């Protein structure tokens, strides 16, 4: 199984930080490896302390379910097939936008999780990091 390297994780975080600065919203940004283990994390000056674990858990959730966290919210509503998911695993699963698997050549090698802004801002910053992963090594 291929997994993200520390150097690649740093480049992902750098790209996400750049987008966060561009939209003027300091963020907590986490990258996990293919096994869901924390590879790198940064809390930008001004980012919420409460968002540290949320960013890490978004990345973990994205790798654990191999999908963007924003895709899980509709499925976790009352009456839906994944209702209660956000309470599973000790509350470590996050079902709103900002977590994205990092894919290369169709394989998931890690994930990014971003938190502090609105869910749209978190998603935008996570997308910038995920896009940067596509160019690592190219």
Where do the language-model regions lie?
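Flexible, solvent-exposed loop/hinge segments and secondary-structure transition points
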Residues: 1-138
